[in-house]
Amino acid sequence: MTQQELTLYNLGENLDQLMNLDPRGYGVCRILYPAARALAKEPLTIHGAKFLVSNIKGGELVYIITGFVLLPFKKAEMDGIVSSVLLARSLIKAFGAKPVLICPEENLKAAKALTSVAGMHCYESVEEVQQFPISM
């Protein structure tokens, strides 16, 4: 194993462990992660990053599906929206991608506000996203 391979492996292991923290004790990640890891044969974060690097081309649309409504409160969750907007910005900067965020209506207000904070423009149509730079 080269130094670069070891670094990627360790980085992926650390990120995977961080993302599998289960402070509420639901246990779902502990059930699903081993099967996904066995299929990928490497840390899932590294596997996903390699997939993005291999498949995203400049100017292409990338669909990001995120968000859900917390029942019975009928309030939108926020961590997925924040992460998705930051992912969109990263895909624009790294690849020149054209991200399209798909989320429940309850998440739209937050998504639009976060888009501005992340230095992007938010449009209602895919055509506008394709036309204008740094947009989502």
Put a short name on every predicted segment:
Residues 1-61:
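Positively charged, low-complexity intrinsically disordered leader regions
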Residues 36-41, 61-62, 66-83:
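Short, glycine-rich nucleotide/cofactor-binding loops
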Residues 66-68, 104-105, 134:
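Fold-independent oxyanion-binding glycine-rich loops
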Residues 77-96:
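Histidine-anchored nucleotide/phosphate-binding helix
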Residues 98-106:
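Short internal beta-strands
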Residues 100-101, 114-116:
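Glycine- and small hydrophobic-enriched segments that form the cores of compact globular domains
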Residues 106-113:
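Short, charged/polar "capping" segments at the starts of alpha-helices
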Residues 115-136:
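A glycine-rich helix N-cap at a beta->alpha junction
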